[in-house]
Curated annotation (Swiss-Prot):
GO biological process: translation
Pfam families: Ribosomal_L31
Name of the protein described by the UniProt record: Large ribosomal subunit protein bL31
Functional description taken from the UniProt entry: Binds the 23S rRNA.
Species in which this protein is naturally found: Ruminiclostridium cellulolyticum (strain ATCC 35319 / DSM 5812 / JCM 6584 / H10)
Keywords linked to the UniProt accession: Metal-binding, Ribonucleoprotein, Ribosomal protein, RNA-binding, rRNA-binding, Zinc
GO CC annotation terms, alphabetical: ribonucleoprotein complex; ribosome
Gene3D superfamilies: Ribosomal protein L31 (4.10.830.30)
Cofactor or coenzyme needed: Zn(2+)
Family designation: Belongs to the bacterial ribosomal protein bL31 family. Type A subfamily.
One Gene Ontology MF term: structural constituent of ribosome
Amino acid sequence: MKEGIHPDYSEAVVKCACGETFTTGSTKKSLHVEICSKCHPFYTGRQKLVDTGGRVDKFKKKYGIVDNE
């Protein structure tokens, strides 16, 4: 690699809107994020499951598709 053309990569503090802080590597000194693994619904278990069955039924009804069950 050439000398002097790469940015300095150092430890950075990441601050979330929920108040959580952690460190990571970055070319910036600090980062601010809106959501992290401590407050994201997928990781906290508060995730809503979307039922796509209603969409499939609507499509079948719209195009007259009959199930052969």
